[in-house]
């Protein structure tokens, strides 16, 4: 049902006119660490509202860097490193403010996808595509759309998965470069909010096993994975639990229930 208007704190941002001027001159925008902006705004909103907690949904997969061998992380402001640094900043400067933490930090993207696959009432309406966000659509042309499809592919029948995107994402050969980056075949992971190569390898391995058992013809990108992949799938990912988190004890039961489901053998 949500909250009534009088219970909502509305915070607005404006674009610096100087940035618009630079854009008109041909300069490109840098990356905006949006999650860090949300962190500071939420801490302020929580303080004036008297809230005890500011709860995020950032997963452990956000900790991985984008460039192999380098500590360059497109998702730094979603990582545990940022969460810890922000908590230290909060404790040092605003000790009475709400506690800032992610309730999904113990879990990886694939575990979250397994949990979400059960909530079919939301499959037609959820979105996780930056390019299509202004139109509330899946663009079906970006690494993010491809990654989400890969994460859900072990847990949904092909027809249900394809109905979410309006197409078979694993058949889109024009996304081979992004696909190879997601799989770890190259040293560069797409600069999008996507999970780890290990998760992608496991997800596609499970999906390939499902196709082989059913006798269905594999889509092009899944065949490409089977032909090119040399990495062993880490099946322990679905039973993993990342201890690097700042979740208060009072939420232990919520986290425990999710862990019991995602770690259970199918």
Locations of regions flagged by a protein language model:
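Nucleotide-activated chemistry modules centered on ATP-dependent adenylation/adenylyltransferase
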Residues: 1-266
